[in-house]
Each structure stands twice: as C-alpha cells, then as structure tokens.
C-alpha cells in the first residue's frame, strides 16, 4: 500500500511544540503496528545547523549517517525509537543549493528557474524520497517556522500541491496553534487560532486536525467554536495542555483521540495503540521522590536547549535508578574566577561538548575537582579532551599541555587535529561525523557498562587524543578503555584509582532512549547515587 503523508504546521507563535506533537503521533502510530517515517523541513537558508550558534538554534543533533540536524530529530528518535538519516532534515538552503546546482549543470535546458515549479518540485521530491527509502506506512513531516513567515511559503505551497499530486485520501494536515488563557478575563481565547487557520486556508490548505496548545483544558463549547470557525469536526480539535513532562504528551494525545482520528481519516489498516509500557514509564516518572543533583559545566548554560539530548539522557538514567536528576547549571567561565563552592555538594559532574576557547579553563578546573575529590565524572567530546589536558598538566607534570585547538603553539599538544582534517578549510559538514565503531577493553568501566566488545557511537569532532602521549599518560594511571578497531583513535578514557571517572570522544546522548538509557549515562548516575547515599536504584 502506498505511504500516507501527514503534514504538521504551526501558527501564532514559534516553540509551540510541533516537534513534540509530531513525535507523539509517531509513537502512537508505531504502537499500532504501523511503520513510521518522520522528517523536519526547516525554512532557513543555512545548509544545516552545524555552523549555527547554539544560542540561535539550540543543540545540533547528529544522525547515524553523519547529518548535522535540528534538535527536533532528537525528539523523533527518542519518542519513536528509530534511527533517522540525512533525508530526515531538509533546509531551504539544501533545496536551493540543489536547484541551483541543477541549473548550472544545464538540467533545466535554459528555462527560467522559479520558486514554482522548480523549488516546490525539489521539496516534493525530498518528501517522496523518505517514503522510497524506508517503505513506511506513514510519513510525518513537520514544517518549521510559523504560517505567515515568508521563508515558509514554498514549503507550504509544496505540501498544498501534494494532495492533488498523490490524492486527497493519502494526505492529512495537522495545524498546531495557540489558545492563550487570559488570567485577567479568566478564560481562554480562540481568536489567535481562528486567524492562524484563516492564514493557512488563504494559501490553499484546510487543516483536518487542529492541535491547541493551552495552559489549561478548555470547555467542549470552546472546541465547538473553534471547529465552527475553522471548518473542521469538533472531535478534530485536540487539546494539548501544559504537562509536567514531555513524555506525558503521547498519552495526552491518545486520550484526546489524535491517533484514532488520523487512522480513520487516512483509512490505515492497524490495531489499537499498545501504550502499556509507555504508560508504566510515565507512572514511574511521576512517582519518583528522591532527588539527585548533577553539575553540568558548560559554555551555553543560559540556553538549556543547547544541551537538550544531554539533559534528556540524564533524565532517562534517573528514571532507571528511580531518582529525579536536578541539574545545577554552571557557566564554566565562572570557575576561572573562583566559584568552586558550586561543585562542593553535587553528586556528579558532567562536562559536555562545545566549541571555542571561552570557558575552557573552567571546564579543566571542573575535571580536576572531580578527579581530586572522587566525584563521579562524565566528559563528552570536548569534555574528554579537557579531562586529558587536565591529567597531563596536573598528574603528568606537563604544565603547558593543551589542545592545539586553543593553543597552536603549546609544547605538549595532548589533543591535536585529526590528520585528515589538516588540509580542510571549510567549516560546514567537514568534521568526523556520524556512527563509528569502538573496541572496548575488557575489565574497564566502559566494558562493564556496555557488556560487549564492539560498540557503535555517533561522533562530531575535528580534534583527537594525540597518541604521542599515550604511553606517558597511561603510565600515570589513565586507562584507554576504548579505541577505534585499528587502535589509531582513542575513544574512551577513564581513571583506574577513581570511583567513576569516564570520558568519551563520541556523543552518547544521541542514542539514549527514555525506556533504554544509554549505558554510560546509566552507570554515571548509578555512581552518583552511590556517592549521594542510598545506592543506585
């Protein structure tokens, strides 16, 4: 049976939760036995978010095949429990680049290249490519931005055309909008939703379902009012009120009947949703009473979305151990000016990835504090590199040790540029990206965590442990517990005489799931629980 297509658009304002809505629907449809593919279309002109500031975009999520993508793909993977590909994130930049390349090659035979049909055809081709690659029952596509944005218009026009291209019975439109609650008036207001749907209909898209983000539930009468003005069935007005945890949203959507309406409208052949495991997970999350505080020492701590997958991975591990992980956000540059008291009473310290030299010395201070005080430590990517620098300086006596990224003239470049990176000048899409194998050493904490010899993890880096210093550092107590299969690249280091000090070059946070925490996060939180007292859950 040909794939059915579901398009999720947003109105009134950004950050309403289109991604969570799409991910929740994907989870519900998968639980019905359907094969689900999902993708995000972003209307910005960047080719990908790889070179964008985290302050503007949040986290860059990396797929198995090395795509640098929008953070919503992390939600998709965690909720639906699938691994996505480069085809799952399409930007306006990629679309225009492809069309311009074809024009330069002469593919359009001298014709005038226009937004319609050339840009819209390219968008539709990328929509259909996902269906061709994975042969799903359903393809869910989230359109980034807000209806009314100039940048979104070609994407909206493309999805409008889809209903005539492949048939109205294979297409369904979901519009996520805002129903604000005005405390002064003591009621919710539907006017923003009405205007947003009017804008959407003006470009030829009639939504089948409206998902209303709201602070609190509203009346059936208000649902009927929205249905009347927006020309949909009252049962297709779905309320999505504020939840304590994003993992409650699929259950909320199921209760509101979202998946049932989708199945009915698209005539999908499937069974009822099997959400018992998810429901049990959420119930466990709600019943947690024990708290555990972890210090996250980073550069972008004023914008937690910059570390979204790390935060979610800590929560997954917390659920496993029956604790709520509370994060103490510490701006790494503050530690360079003192402020060590911020680290004194935490159960664990995590130093995540990052770029640039601002705050680097503060991260080194955090790694040293964890090493000297026996505090469980997890370093990720740059966090591993700086743990190596700290060890070289303060244990091996290489006082000027550094990464050549931050000091090209250092006499001891314990972290250096990967050989294959030395001639590369472009910044975008040129790092060591995606899934690579790693061989673990038996008897190490890493091997104990994974329980297997060969693992596969996602990477995003240019710099690597300098093997010229491997013998010197291991002689002083550093353990190389994971390497590339050819032993050329150091992937994981740990300390032998420490309760739990592990750092990895890859990004374990991208493979954690709410019902299956990543082994390193799981054991890190387990060690933190033991330090806090009471043992791991």
Curated annotation (Swiss-Prot):
Described purpose of this protein according to its UniProt entry: Catalyzes the ATP-dependent amination of UTP to CTP with either L-glutamine or ammonia as the source of nitrogen. Regulates intracellular CTP levels through interactions with the four ribonucleotide triphosphates.
Quaternary structure note: Homotetramer.
Protein known as: CTP synthase
Binding residues annotated for Mg(2+), in chain numbering: 72, 142
Annotated binding of L-glutamine, by residue: 55, 354, 382-385, 405, 462
Alphabetical list of CDD domains matching this protein: CTPS_N (cd03113), GATase1_CTP_Synthase (cd01746)
Note: CTPSs have evolved a hybrid strategy for distinguishing between UTP and CTP. The overlapping regions of the product feedback inhibitory and substrate sites recognize a common feature in both compounds, the triphosphate moiety. To differentiate isosteric substrate and product pyrimidine rings, an additional pocket far from the expected kinase/ligase catalytic site, specifically recognizes the cytosine and ribose portions of the product inhibitor.
Keywords assigned by UniProt, alphabetized: ATP-binding, Glutamine amidotransferase, Ligase, Magnesium, Metal-binding, Nucleotide-binding, Pyrimidine biosynthesis
Claim: Metal-binding is one of the keywords in the record: yes
InterPro entries registered for this protein in UniProt: Class_I_gatase-like, CTP_synthase, CTP_synthase_N, GATASE, GATase1_CTP_Synthase, P-loop_NTPase
EC number annotated for this UniProt entry: 6.3.4.2
Cellular component terms per the entry's GO annotation: cytosol
Binding site for ATP: 15-20, 72
A GO molecular-function descriptor: ATP binding
